[in-house]
Amino acid sequence: ISSARNLAELDELRQINAQIMDPRGLSEKKINRLIKKGRVVVCQSMSLHASEISATQMAAELAYDLVTDTAEETKKILDNTIFLMVPCFNPDGQIMVTDWYNEYVGTEYEGTSMPWLYHRYCGHDNNRDAFMLNLVESQYMARIMFREWNPQVFQDHHEMGTYGPRLFLVPYSEPIHPHGDPLIWRELNWYGAHMAYKLEEAGIQGVITGAIFGGWAHLGFHWIGNYHNITSMLTETAHARLATPIYVHPHQLVGDGSATLRAMPHYKPQTNFPNPWPGGWWGVRNMIEQQLVASKALLHHAAQYRETVLKNAVQKALRQTQRGAEEQSAGFLIRPDQHDPLTVATLINKLLLQGIDIQRTRHRVALGGVTYPAGTYFVSLNQPKRGVIKSLLERTFFPDDAW
């Protein structure tokens, strides 16, 4: 979704975007020309978990508003961004959940969970597949995010528990993973603050930031994207009983029950949660309204600061490349002649699906007392995707400290 002019120049803008996200070898003058011409690419996906129904219902309304609204703010979004929307990440599961819900509306089972998985091969864990990319839906998303478009910004819309805040926005809570560029974590604060402000402006209560969901977690798309230099985030909307509203009494609203660094020990006002929702009826329309505001606010912020976002994208790519060039370890050598060559080929393919550059040696290489044959794979850290390479191929240890 974009302006008619941008859509007419889509192939050129995609090529410009590819150079912005990987500016190696470009002069400063060339980079500045690309930034002047480029558009911010924003991707948002909905209802990866099929039982989290509201985002897919919101998607059609979001698209309609963007293509019909004549307000200046919407025009700025269309002129300055290219919006890639995945309205339903798991359409088969969405149909299953819808059919189950409709079958039992008006019975004692209305709004209950299905007694089988809404994804045949992985259930709820499709949100853990952004690094292995075993599922066809994950492969499709990886093609968009890591090879064909490489957006500057990604947001994934989810649902969470019923008896707490109404909406979570980034930044994530502590701790953070070590391999993202520091600008990523600043940008998450930047986007999250703007979305939270716009929600408060719209009179929507119960929005929390910097809590509950940590910055070191499984490698779903909204986490692994950060190590690709894509500012990647999620929203989490309070759940209802699928499409059936529920009534939440004030005494049912609670924090996480402990003074942890998840940053919500109690359900009462605090700096990242200044306007608690008091309770009452809660249903899909409430969920859609806040997701619409958050989605549009993200797009508007990217459009408003188009050049800054693109400059940051260049800076993140160059910084990560430079860090890789200066590290003690230049990269990873992977022998092709191991006892299980098919698994080697699978590993290399997984890395290629991430858009990682991989080279092969022309001759034998002797290193550290080991001789590697010609044709050995070399995954250099001297590239913009250094963060994701280190996240996938190095050992990392969750901090054994206050976090």
Stretch-by-stretch model annotation:
Residues 52, 95, 161-163, 241:
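Hydrophobic positions within alpha-helical membrane elements
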Residues 145-160:
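Proline-aspartate-enriched helix->loop->beta-strand connector
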Residues 78-97, 382:
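Short, conserved secondary-structure transition motifs
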Residues 107-125, 267-271:
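Aromatic- and acidic-residue-enriched carbohydrate-binding clefts of CAZyme catalytic domains
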Residues 97-109:
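Aromatic- and acidic-residue-enriched segments that line the glycan-binding/catalytic groove
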Residues 86-90, 101, 156-164:
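Short, solvent-exposed turn/loop segments enriched in Gly/Ser/Thr/Pro and often Arg
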Residues 1-53, 60-82, 128-129, 134-136, ...:
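Intrinsic-disorder/low-complexity accessory segments
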